[in-house]
Design a protein with these regions (language model features):
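Bacterial N-terminal signal peptides
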Residues: 8-19
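Short, highly charged low-complexity linear segments
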Residues: 13, 112-119, 133
Length: 159
């Protein structure tokens, strides 16, 4: 039995942060990339991975412990659809279906609230950062050629 694998499947996250007026809440964001590693086209098991978005915030001096509502939304990527995002093979037209989810049960698509997706909102305080996990899944049974596949997702953080 010959096994073909895909290596270096990467999703690149682009972070957009919004500047706020002086004296407003100050937040910092760190995003780790999501890499699926090798994908076995003969496996009956989906390929899963995860990434983390960490948001830390400081409130203004007059109320340093104030909770700050933070919202995180993700773009649909190059496919333009939350129903099924797609990784494209570098140098070729081949596509590999995948999606990003809010929970490890892979039941809720993480997006911007449109097209059946949901954004995520949480309260962040000076002492309590938000470590939001993005759960990625490539469904099994996709017959694609070996190569590097990627997509670009824009992560939008609002506070």
């Amino acid at each position: 039995m010959r096994i073909r694998s895909l290596y270096s499947i990467m999703i690149v996250f682009i972070l957009l942060a919004f500047a706020l007026p002086a004296g407003a809440f100050n937040c910092n964001v760190n995003v780790t990339g999501l890499s699926f590693g090798g994908y076995d086209v003969f496996s009956a098991i989906p390929k899963d991975s995860a990434a983390t978005i960490t948001v830390t915030c400081n409130a203004p001096p007059q109320n340093p412990n104030a909770p700050i509502p933070v919202s995180i939304s993700l773009s649909p990527g190059s496919s333009g659809s939350f129903a099924q995002r797609q990784l494209q093979r570098l140098g070729g037209p081949e596509l590999l279906a995948y999606n990003l989810f809010t929970t490890p049960s892979f039941s809720t698509v993480w997006g911007d609230g449109s097209g059946g997706s949901q954004s995520q909102t949480n309260l962040v305080t000076r002492t309590t950062p938000w470590n939001a996990t993005i759960f990625g899944r490539i469904p099994a049974g996709q017959n694609v050629p070996a190569g590097s596949y990627s997509d670009v997702i824009t992560v939008t953080i609002e506070w």
